[in-house]
Amino acid sequence: MAATIKKGALVRVVTGNLENSLEALASDRRLPSYMFNSTAEVLDVKDDYALIKFYVPTPSVWLKLEQLEPV
């Protein structure tokens, strides 16, 4: 699955893979609902991470590829 995620792809965040992950534990535990209820665009891919942009006025965020699924 991770191999199919490339720059410009539309993705969704996989709730089960993000909750209780190292990335989620390192930030505010109250994750915003738009992360799980909307799609995001992949801006860049480096190693096991993708920089994604949601279509709401928020900063882009790096997430592991295993926490994303193609739309």
UniProtKB/Swiss-Prot annotation:
Entry's Gene Ontology cellular component terms: plasma membrane-derived thylakoid membrane
Keywords from the named record: Membrane, NAD, NADP, Plastoquinone, Quinone, Thylakoid, Translocase, Transport
Highest rank taxon of the organism: Bacteria
Catalytic activity from the UniProt record: a plastoquinone + NADH + (n+1) H(+)(in) = a plastoquinol + NAD(+) + n H(+)(out); a plastoquinone + NADPH + (n+1) H(+)(in) = a plastoquinol + NADP(+) + n H(+)(out)
EC number(s) recorded for this UniProt protein: 7.1.1.-
Main location: membrane
GO molecular function, one term: quinone binding
InterPro entries in UniProt: NdhO
Enzyme class: translocase
Localization of this protein: Cellular thylakoid membrane
Membrane topology label: Peripheral membrane protein
Similarity field: Belongs to the complex I NdhO subunit family.
Role description: NDH-1 shuttles electrons from an unknown electron donor, via FMN and iron-sulfur (Fe-S) centers, to quinones in the respiratory and/or the photosynthetic chain. The immediate electron acceptor for the enzyme in this species is believed to be plastoquinone. Couples the redox reaction to proton translocation, and thus conserves the redox energy in a proton gradient. Cyanobacterial NDH-1 also plays a role in inorganic carbon-concentration.
Assembly description: NDH-1 can be composed of about 15 different subunits; different subcomplexes with different compositions have been identified which probably have different functions.
Name of the protein described by the UniProt record: NAD(P)H-quinone oxidoreductase subunit O
Native source organism of the sequence: Microcystis aeruginosa (strain NIES-843 / IAM M-2473)
